[in-house]
Amino acid sequence: MNDDDLPPLHPTPPGLYRHYKGGWYEVLDTVRCSETLQGMTLYRALYGGWGLWVRPAAMFAEVGVFEGCEQPRFTPHDPAQVPLADLATAQALIAHLRGLAQRRGIDLDAALRPPPPEPETCCGRGCNGCVWEGYYTALHHWREDALERVLAASR
């Protein structure tokens, strides 16, 4: 069999996605199952063990009734527009941008200052000027610089 005989692949665009249950994922590519020839989305979790996964591309892209609402299983997000308001999102964004840069031959930690460290001194009382506000502001600037480097490497 040659490539002309294969069914269409219907690729999932690479990028940053959020699952309807809240987890962040990075789509790396669309691959083909050697047994069924079905298009499979190759993605990695941006939390926990950071494992690689495959799922049928049609299932990855489906809209269904999940948790009582009709919604997409996975929703794409522009890394430049992701709100920085919680640690899981911040960690996912950093991992996604590092991976994206690495695939373009850039070591972000060598090319830029490293992303800001997570605060360790928050009292949890919601203070004005909380250390988390400073963290998310610094991360916003790191994100801008990282995206600028990645986009420049794509040109």
Predicted regions and their residues:
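Amphipathic alpha-helical interface surfaces
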Residues: 23, 39, 93, 123, ...
